[in-house]
Amino acid sequence: MQWQEDALVLHAAPLGESGAVVTVLSETHGLHRGLLKRQKVTVGDLVRALWTARLPEHLGTWALDVKKKYSASVLRDPLRLQELMLTCELLRRLLTERTPCNDVYDQAMHCLEAIRGPAFTWAKEYLILELFLLSKVGFGLDVRDAVLATEDDPLRYVSPRTGRVVTQSRGQPYHDKLLRLPEFFVNSSAELDTDSLQEGFALTEFFIQL
């Protein structure tokens, strides 16, 4: 049996002298591993992947045709390269193997396309991907109070215990016990600044470490 589609290389574990067990993320087949022989790929490569196996439960083998090397575009920027590696590792660790996740794939590709852009834009897309992944593994934000939000009293805080989002007025009395919600998480046109990005990283990091 076999399947073929575009995929993102997330990890390559050397096996023997000329092989590797390569993990990719594809739109239809999700996180998927296979044996790659006598060929080298790099984490962050977009490939045309052909997976072949005798039975569905087997590891199978890859034939990978590189279409785009995202790492090549950031090789001279160590920080961006590290962020690319971090993105791929995050996907590998949080997703369940062989589970379709076309929405995650689309969001991941959108994130990687932004990696060569302005630093604030890349950071925003990365945080949105983290938040999206958290929702997929059961740690999504509870926004039932969104109907209570107004221009003067926006959604502003997140409970670290339940993930529930509350408005500024409801959360203010407990602000020292709550996580802050950056505006761009609920308003895509919100202005980005260092403070809002720091709030975003503090929020997603808390739940990813749980």
Where is each model-derived feature located?
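Non-catalytic alpha-helical scaffolds and adjoining flexible linkers that form interface surfaces
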Residues: M1-V21, L25-L210
